[in-house]
Amino acid sequence: LAGKSSEGSLEAAERALLARLPPPWRSGRLAPLASGLTNCNYRLRLPSGRSHFLRQGHPDPVRLGIDRATEWQLYQGAVGQGLALPCHHSDPASGLMLLDWCDEPNWLAAPPPAALQPGLLAGVLTRLHRLPVPSVVMAVRAHSAGYRARLARVPTWLPALERGLLASREPADCWLPCHHDLNPANLLGSRPWVIDWEYGAAGHPGFEVASIQRTHNWQDAQREALEQSYCERAGGPVGPRGFQSRAFLPWVDYIGLLWALLMAEQQPGPDYQALIDLNRQRLE
């Protein structure tokens, strides 16, 4: 009985989701996809045989430092640059987006050859940096402070771990449009298409590159290859002092740690604990 009740509530939720779409898409059927750590994702199949990608964003974006209006602004610009899949319907207030379907696997499932990845991501960044700079800024110190303030319980080991980083000074000399989550799961195919723009905002490009290095498990040489390829494509360095990405590596670890602690409070599980352990180890 419990299983049937659970299935029934799931079907009701999916029907409610379909009802929020414009009429042409309400007749489709939803098939759940492997969701990200914060989103619910579906394949929407229409009677015509066409498919679309339906994304329902996290219900509490403020807790995670997500600005839906900025996400939508950047997404529209990214479509124009050929970075993001065309969008057929969007409700920025709720994080609902209906996109073209893409059959290409993400880089977790089928990564391009390692030697090509820095150049491909340099291409993503050069096109991304052509967009207008958003008014909403994701500065690492303020962003991490927001996460920390929302923790219901601060681990006893955290103050000593963060003390040195918080006493340092991070670069703050360049602000450009940033995705802030260019991890392998958010890159589709060899183009690549970029998905999940939730953390998009103005940011320091060095933090973007440091985040790429961490989430792709790159060595310094691959990060440096990305930066060199970017300079060649853009016709010069980024900002007055270059990427300065090494200075942002501990900030990537710190923000990743706080994010995982926040998510674990809401939904404890092994995935979040693994992220907590990894980022804590990197900061020690």
Identify the residue ranges that each predicted region occupies.
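ATP-binding pocket architecture of kinase catalytic cores
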Residues: 31-137
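Active-site acidic catalytic loop and adjacent metal/ATP-binding pocket
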Residues: 34-46, 50-54, 165-207
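Start-of-helix signal in alpha-solenoid helical-repeat scaffolds, especially tetratricopeptide repeats
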Residues: 68, 247-251
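ATP/Mg2+ or Mg2+-diphosphate-binding catalytic cores
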Residues: 258-284
